[in-house]
């Protein structure tokens, strides 16, 4: 054996055959396999590939004791992680293929190789391939017992990888598996990661108000970096704006409007107009649109973008506070959409209980039901108080001495 100069395929095959019939102790036999593996790794190019393939085939052979083959396959897994990605990926797949007939005997070793393969795919942004490799690990059904933290972390990673591949359906499947485990761990880091993934799944699935609530919760978690907390708050604001108009969104708008941190976000202007129930024009949405992710720019069933649909509904609710009734034509002009579309949106919101009113088809008029005035006045007074407080705070910063004299 020439440890410093590699080994030929013929010589390797001969030595492997000799080791099968080795009569010494398991420890001595394992040491000889390790020395032979070390020699194979000194090869280069095709000789390295051929040598490792031959070595793997030999050690997973049923004639080699499991005590030995498991140890040496662990060593092979460690060495695979040191090779260049392309070479390591090819040899990892080869190893998994050869082990497959006896996979139950090598669960731990196979899992290690799969985790390694997933990291390679992830580094190369091959998200779906990385997820698929991890899905192949029998976390619940295998003989090996995995810790709650390992299973939870793996499910969350699979969900995140599917999200990166824009497959929210598969991501939700693994988030649901993770949800059964997240209460069993004391790891705050994993719990936060679960909440992040869950919020993203809700976001991708267009369950915007639920996503906004989760993002808003994350924005208060001390374990999360300050910059990440502000990112979560921004996402909460974006999802709230994109959500369907109704009581849930109104409550979320109020929560965010009262959060002083939101005043520093680029989308604050839209938040303010929505909370104060003001009409929003299409020209005012350009800055907000630039904040949207690709999945948030998708079209709805009527061809409108998600944002346009949300703004149409908001403007319709705002109009219901200004008018007792309005014709389809006037409503369409107010919302800057065709009258037929305006009628359809109004009809849907009334049917779903998100707006009070009724439609007179014969007269082509939407009638808005009278609201109690006191709650409206309360909101308007509350809004005015917030704005006055904001002005006072700005004066205090700019002219503290003048404010002291007033006191």
UniProtKB/Swiss-Prot annotation:
Taxonomic lineage: Eukaryota, Metazoa, Ecdysozoa, Arthropoda, Hexapoda
Protein name, please?
COP9 signalosome complex subunit 4
Which family, according to the similarity comment?
Belongs to the CSN4 family.
A GO CC annotation recorded here is: COP9 signalosome
Q: Which organism is it from?
A: Drosophila melanogaster (Fruit fly)
Which Gene Ontology molecular function entries are recorded, alphabetically?
Answer: transcription cis-regulatory region binding
Known function: Component of the COP9 signalosome complex (CSN), a complex involved in various cellular and developmental processes. The CSN complex is an essential regulator of the ubiquitin (Ubl) conjugation pathway by mediating the deneddylation of the cullin subunits of the SCF-type E3 ligase complexes, leading to decrease the Ubl ligase activity of SCF. The CSN complex plays an essential role in oogenesis and embryogenesis and is required for proper photoreceptor R cell differentiation and promote lamina glial cell migration or axon targeting.
> How would you summarize the oligomeric state and partners of this protein?
Component of the CSN complex, probably composed of CSN1b, alien/CSN2, CSN3, CSN4, CSN5, CSN6, CSN7 and CSN8. Interacts directly with CSN7.
Keyword Amino-acid biosynthesis annotated? no
Entry keyword Nucleus: yes
Sorted alphabetically, which keywords does the UniProt record give? Answer: Cytoplasm, Developmental protein, Differentiation, Nucleus, Oogenesis, Signalosome
What the entry lists under InterPro entries is as follows: CSN4_HTH (IPR041406), PCI_dom (IPR000717), PSMD12-CSN4-like_N (IPR054559), PSMD12/CSN4 (IPR040134), WH-like_DNA-bd_sf (IPR036388), WH_DNA-bd_sf (IPR036390)
Where is the signal peptide, in residue numbers? none
What positions does the domain PCI occupy?
Answer: 204-373
Subcellular location(s): the record lists:
Cytoplasm; Nucleus
A Gene Ontology biological process noted in the UniProt record is: germ cell development
A Pfam family per the record: PSMD12-CSN4_N
């Amino acid at each position: 054996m020439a440890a410093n100069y590699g080994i030929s395929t013929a010589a390797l095959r001969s030595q492997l055959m000799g080791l099968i019939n080795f009569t010494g102790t398991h420890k001595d036999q394992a040491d000889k396999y390790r020395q032979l593996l070390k020699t194979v790794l000194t090869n280069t190019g095709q000789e390295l590939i051929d040598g490792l393939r031959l070595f793997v085939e030999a050690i997973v052979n049923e004639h080699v004791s499991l005590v030995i083959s498991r140890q040496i396959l662990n060593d092979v897994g460690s060495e695979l992680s040191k090779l260049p990605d392309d070479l390591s990926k090819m040899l990892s797949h080869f190893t998994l293929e050869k082990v497959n007939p006896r996979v139950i005997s090598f669960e731990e070793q196979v899992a290690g190789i799969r985790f390694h393969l997933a990291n390679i795919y992830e580094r190369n942004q091959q998200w779906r391939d990385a997820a698929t490799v991890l899905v192949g690990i029998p976390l619940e059904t295998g003989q090996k017992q995995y810790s709650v933290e390992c299973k939870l972390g793996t499910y969350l990673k699979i969900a995140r990888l599917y999200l990166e591949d824009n497959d929210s359906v598969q991501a939700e499947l693994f988030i649901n598996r993770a949800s059964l485990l997240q209460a069993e761990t004391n790891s705050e880091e994993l719990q936060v990661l679960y909440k992040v993934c869950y919020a993203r799944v809700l976001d991708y699935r267009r369950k915007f108000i639920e996503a906004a609530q989760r993002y808003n919760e994350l924005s208060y978690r001390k374990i999360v970096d300050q910059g990440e907390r502000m990112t979560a708050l921004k996402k909460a604001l974006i999802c709230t704006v994109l959500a369907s108009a109704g009581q849930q969104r109104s409550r979320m708008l109020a929560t965010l409007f009262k959060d002083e941190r939101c005043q520093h976000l680029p989308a604050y202007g839209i938040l303010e107009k929505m909370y104060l129930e003001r009409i929003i024009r299409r020209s005012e949405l350009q800055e907000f649109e630039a904040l949207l992710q690709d999945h948030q720019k998708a079209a709805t069933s009527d061809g409108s973008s998600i944002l346009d649909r949300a703004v149409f509904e908001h403007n319709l609710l705002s109009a219901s506070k200004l008018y007792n009734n309005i014709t389809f034509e006037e409503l369409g002009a107010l919302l800057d959409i065709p009258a037929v579309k305006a009628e359809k949106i109004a009809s849907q919101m009334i049917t779903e209980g998100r707006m009070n009113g009724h439609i007179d088809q014969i007269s082509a008029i939407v009638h808005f039901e009278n609201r109690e005035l006191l709650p409206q006045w309360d909101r308007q007074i509350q809004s005015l108080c917030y704005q006055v407080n904001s002005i006072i705070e700005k004066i205090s910063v700019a002219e503290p001495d003048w404010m002291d004299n007033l006191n």
